[in-house]
Amino acid sequence: MNSVNKLLEKSFKSNWDRPAISNYRGATITYGQLSYNIVATHIMFEKCGIKPGDKISICSKNQANWGVAFLASLTYGAVPVPILNEFKSGTIHHLVNHSNSRLLYVGEAIWENLSPSEMPEVEAIAQMENFSVLYAKDSELKRDRLNIDAIMQERYGDSFGPDSLCFYEDSPEELALINYTSGTSGFSKGVMIPYRALYSNIKFGSYAMPSLNNRSRVVS
């Protein structure tokens, strides 16, 4: 199995009831709850017309929902674009545009200094802390977000579980994510990272740190 997303799918299914991610001194969600949030986010991507290969920018401080947004983007086949939350608004506007991002996840404090008009290709902007829709070209999107649990119920009924997962199957040379440098000399440079690089890191990590398992805790 050389697909990163299929490795994630297998892991989520195998650890469904185990804790997955937490906020520091905050709530913890299981892999099952994480999967629910990811699939619900995939539905919102569909509503926005997002397709595999489209770029999704993520700009906020570290928090559990950052992981949800990143994993949802990756497992949908979209290309996550992490942006440092310390950047000034002009730099964030530039990187969102430079990456041709169609969606933006943003922290509440950062949003106060951003302007959708400066990012004309962006279809929607969501607040990272609660995934509420801050801006959308399609006026129906805010309503869909408010009704996402009902939409999930309509699609899956009461049977949402491990068998409901079917993540996008990536190929080794396919673009996985765009990682921008800190921009010490002028604007940041975007590094295009293929899935084979992620896959190699996963395999090397399991070899180099054999004691790391599904009971280990990792600080990010």
Go through the PLM ranges and name each one.
Residues T30-G32, F167-Y168, A176-K203:
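Conserved AMP-binding A3 loop
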Residues M1-A20, Y36:
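A short N-terminal helical cap/helix-turn-helix that marks the beginning
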Residues S60, I83-L84, V122-K137:
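Short beta-strand elements of ligand-binding domains
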Residues D17-G49, D54-Q63, G67-L71, K88-H93, ...:
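Conserved AMP-binding/adenylate-forming core of the ANL superfamily
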Residues K55, K61-V81, N85-S89, N97-L103, ...:
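A short helix-loop-beta submotif of the ANL/AMP-binding
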Residues S35-T41, P172, V191-N213:
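Conserved structural elements of the adenylate-forming
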Residues F87-S117, N201-V219:
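Conserved ATP-dependent adenylate/AMP-binding module captured primarily in the ANL superfamily
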Residues W16-D17, Q127, R143-L146, A150-Y180, ...:
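Conserved pre-ATP/AMP-binding loop-to-beta segment of ANL
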